[in-house]
């Protein structure tokens, strides 16, 4: 395997070719990653991923510690969340996937109506949404937003299911929010807005209101939306003037909520003062909202749900689920987000967490970082699956030929990597119960990350043998394009390799290696030097031990 620049590698390759029975184990010369277009083309042509007749891996939406709420589409995810929160409901609130501003104030109304929120396409009622409505046995629907975001056809589709439909739609998002507030005041069964809490949040961005939404549901608290300048309009102020709430909460700093809004919020609080929850970033604010909810509103850290801050859709329906459980929603970007740090400081109170959305929303690496922060193993993730990659082999260079890799002392690297990969995979599956895919069939080296992703794997461990006159074992991660958690994965697996092989520890290193570049947290193991007779004698005397040690390290990462 190459460990140097092209020029040096070429010189060493020429020199070593003069030594009988020896070869320099090079990586292919070009280690730049493929473009997304090239990867998508390979997927479309069936060059990566499961073959049509290949059995699909068993899917798991949850483990003892993690629940995943992720469907093929945002409508599937929404339906999963709604049906987890409710087995039956008279009402449903239906919002369009293009109308998140209208949905920001929906969770409080869902608390008043004691019902779930469902997401639909704006052009017609999504099949998944219709199916969820049937399962819930709903007879009434409230839709939010005008025909620019939700067509008349959606209303017709709902009515064809036998639902009485009330559409709440104003000329602006603040007008719609006021219609939601007035609707909640005359809700059936004697339920209405409580006086426990009221919140004020930007109507121009969703992050702060989304973090507060479980509280809005649980407390039946109205959320009043400010305009682009952070101000309330006269109708909003008039509706609240003279009311007194136990908590009047302003979400976000002066950029999104003006000083006038803060002052007005204080005037409708029994204490005469608003509670301002505003951090330097949307993630800081999310952590502050969660802490306030736990400390002041009887919420809990258990069952905390992580969701993306890029789009609101994965958490709109989930906010109701969180509100029913009195659990928090936490916005996350990566493992260093303040929300992760906040939850980790309370990990003794956490027996389960949730993820809203798939890997595009909360990446594999971020999930793995969260698991470590909470003191759990990667394998505690729902759906955790390891891609064990045997280096080299058939079509490794995308030329249709079988690539032996390094050759030395009568051994071919590709034979050794395939054997060890199979051993590690068998131990992971049969001893530790960890799902894995063993790639002992080769394939273009630049597509192995994509293959792992297409097979829904969470992490990747690539097995290689070294060459070039040295001795010992080492591991690699990508020098500049490693997925989040790659270093932690390397740091966890490297000692297992060293312990198993028992040769010199050459260290944890970085290198530009295509198989390590991409969305999958990955590390590459250089087991020993194939052209060193002592290294190979040592390895061959303990193949099972090496496999067991590596598998143990992966299982306990």
Model-inferred region functions:
Residues 6, 26-379:
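Extracellular glycan-binding segments that recognize GlcNAc-based cell-wall polysaccharides
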Residues 11-19:
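Bacterial N-terminal signal peptides
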């Amino acid at each position: 395997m190459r460990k140097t620049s092209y020029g040096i590698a070429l010189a060493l390759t020429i020199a070593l070719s003069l030594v009988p029975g020896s070869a320099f184990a090079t990586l292919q010369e070009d280690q730049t990653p493929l473009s997304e277009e090239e990867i998508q083309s390979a997927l479309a042509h069936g060059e990566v991923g499961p073959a049509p007749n290949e059995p699909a891996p068993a899917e798991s939406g949850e483990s003892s510690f993690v629940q995943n709420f992720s469907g093929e589409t945002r409508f599937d995810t929404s339906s999963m969340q709604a049906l987890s929160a409710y087995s039956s409901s008279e009402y449903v609130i239906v919002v369009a996937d293009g109308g998140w501003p209208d949905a920001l104030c929906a969770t409080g109304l869902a608390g008043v109506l004691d019902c779930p929120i469902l997401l639909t396409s704006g052009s017609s009622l999504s099949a998944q949404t219709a199916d969820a409505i049937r399962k819930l046995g709903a007879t009434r629907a409230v839709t939010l937003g005008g025909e620019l975001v939700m067509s008349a056809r959606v209303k017709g589709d709902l009515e064809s299911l036998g639902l009485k439909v009330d559409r709440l739609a104003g000329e602006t998002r603040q007008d719609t929010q006021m219609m939601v507030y007035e609707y909640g005041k005359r809700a059936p069964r004697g339920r209405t807005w409580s006086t426990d809490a009221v919140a004020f949040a930007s109507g121009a961005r969703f992050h702060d209101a989304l973090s507060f939404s479980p509280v809005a549901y649980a407390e039946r608290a109205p959320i009043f939306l400010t305009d682009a300048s952070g101000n309330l309009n006269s109708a909003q102020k008039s509706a609240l003037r003279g009311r007194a709430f136990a908590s009047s909460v302003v979400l976000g700093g002066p950029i999104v909520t003006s000083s006038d809004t803060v002052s007005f919020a204080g005037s409708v609080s029994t204490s005469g003062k608003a509670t301002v929850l505003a951090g330097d970033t949307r993630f800081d604010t999310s952590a502050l909202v969660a802490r306030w909810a736990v400390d002041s509103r009887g919420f809990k850290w258990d069952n905390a749900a992580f969701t993306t801050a890029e789009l609101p859709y994965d958490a709109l329906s989930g906010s109701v689920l969180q509100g029913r459980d009195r659990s928090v929603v936490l916005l996350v970007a990566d493992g260093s987000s303040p929300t992760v740090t906040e939850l980790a400081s309370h990990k003794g109170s956490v027996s389960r967490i949730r993820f809203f959305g798939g890997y595009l929303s909360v990446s594999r690496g971020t999930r793995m970082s969260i698991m470590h922060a909470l003191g759990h193993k990667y394998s505690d993730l729902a759906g955790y699956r390891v891609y064990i990659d045997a280096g080299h082999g058939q079509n490794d260079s995308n030329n249709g030929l079988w690539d032996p890799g390094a050759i030395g002392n009568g051994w071919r690297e590709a034979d050794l990597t395939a054997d060890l990969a199979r051993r590690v995979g068998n131990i992971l599956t049969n001893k530790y119960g960890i799902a894995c895919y063993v790639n002992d069939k080769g394939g273009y080296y630049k597509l192995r990350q994509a293959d792992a992703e297409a097979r829904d794997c969470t992490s990747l461990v690539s097995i290689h043998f070294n060459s070039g006159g040295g001795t010992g074992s080492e591991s690699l991660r990508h020098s500049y394009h490693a997925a989040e958690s790659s270093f932690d994965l390397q740091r966890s697996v490297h000692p297992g390799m060293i312990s198993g092989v028992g040769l010199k520890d050459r260290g944890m290193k970085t290198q530009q290696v295509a198989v390590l570049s991409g969305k999958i947290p990955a590390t590459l193991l250089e087991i020993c030097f194939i052209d060193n007779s002592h290294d190979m004698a040592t390895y061959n005397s303990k193949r099972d031990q090496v496999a067991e040690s590596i598998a143990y390290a992966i299982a306990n990462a």
